[in-house]
Amino acid sequence: MLIIHGTVHTMDGPAIDNGFVAIREGKIWKVGPMEECPADWKGETLDARGGHILPGFVDAHCHLGMFGDAMGFEGDDGNEATDPCTPHLRAIDGVNPMDRCFRDARLAGVTTVLTGPGSANPISGQFVAMKTAGRWLDDMVIKAPAAMKLALGENPKLTYHERHEGPITRMATAAVIRENLAKAVEYRDKLERAAADPDEEKPEFDAKLEALLPVVRRELPVHIHAHRADDIATGIRICKEFGLEYVIVHGTEGHLIANELAREGARVITGPCLGDRSKPELANMSLETPVLLAMAGVKIAICTDHPETPVQYLPLCAAMAVKGGLPADAALAAITIWAAEIGGVAHRVGSLTTGKDGDVVVMSGHPLNWLSRVSAVVVDGRRVTE
């Protein structure tokens, strides 16, 4: 496919005012100004007609396909609220790719999502990075697992308080995480000793600890649900204790500790910003959080947390960050290349770079202008819009 005559936002360099994007065998083949456009192109050609051409949007944190749209309990598969520690739960076993919200995502230009379990459990389970086009989930997966979800703050407290079980305090929530990480470290060490010495007894198989092995081996990052500043600090404290790779998710009060987060080298997926202050830990929610974090030197992404904010409003969330002071280029990066980098999938998506997946969005105007319309969406070199 050849897409021509548009302002090309490559996200790996400056925009090209009148450019083209060529896709071959599902991958980005060539990008440049129209003067360099292949003259002998034989395949499908799409004229952007002076619009904007950019990589497919990436939602770095949502629950797409985990909470079925308008399905009630039958479609509610995001929280296994029967056990505070469920690292062995895999999003790929819960996502419904037939959920109509996948279509909503595609039509809005959101071509990649990181989706997975909610935040009822301190250790919630495994996220998946996947495309929004397709019917057979295994064919849509980019990376599984993509992250291990941890949760701090009000959600685990409320979940288990209502069940008259623990944890019901922030201390207990942190203790659940620490205890199971410590068990995983011990399990890892026993496996390594058994592998090195035939006389050492191999530990009995444990599905939960097996799932945590990539975490304590620094092969899989943890995504920490945390809104309040003290919960953010607790999450980082635990990760430093166990030497984990981590990303803060939501970080609602991150702007209050922006310099400290920069000092710690934290990465933050901010949002959702389109909603009310529905619980106490959202009291300091602000549209300025992304810009204040970015100004401090924190790498950010912007998410919808679908269904909290419908996934199709990801570009609007980025536009609202611009309203809060974030430069437009940074806001666009936060839903493309930065989101892909934080999500560990930048080798495949997030920019119009030669060799990456042919995921492209064509819009009638600037992508952060809410009046701009999506003209076409291409995933893996195939047009997926009607």
Question: What are these language model-derived features?
Answer:
Residues 69-70, 76-81, 86-88, 221, ...:
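His/Asp/Glu-enriched, well-ordered alpha-helical/loop segment
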Residues 203-205, 224-228, 249-252, 278-287:
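A general structural motif
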Residues 6, 21, 26, 50, ...:
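Divalent metal-coordination and catalytic microenvironments
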Residues 101, 106-246:
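Polyanionic/metal-chelating signatures
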Residues 68-95, 133-136, 149-163, 201-202, ...:
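Active-site gating loops and adjacent loop-to-helix segments of metal-dependent hydrolytic enzymes
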Residues 8, 12-54:
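Histidine-rich, glycine-flanked metal-binding segment
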Residues 6-10, 341, 353-386:
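C-terminal cap of metal-dependent C-N hydrolases
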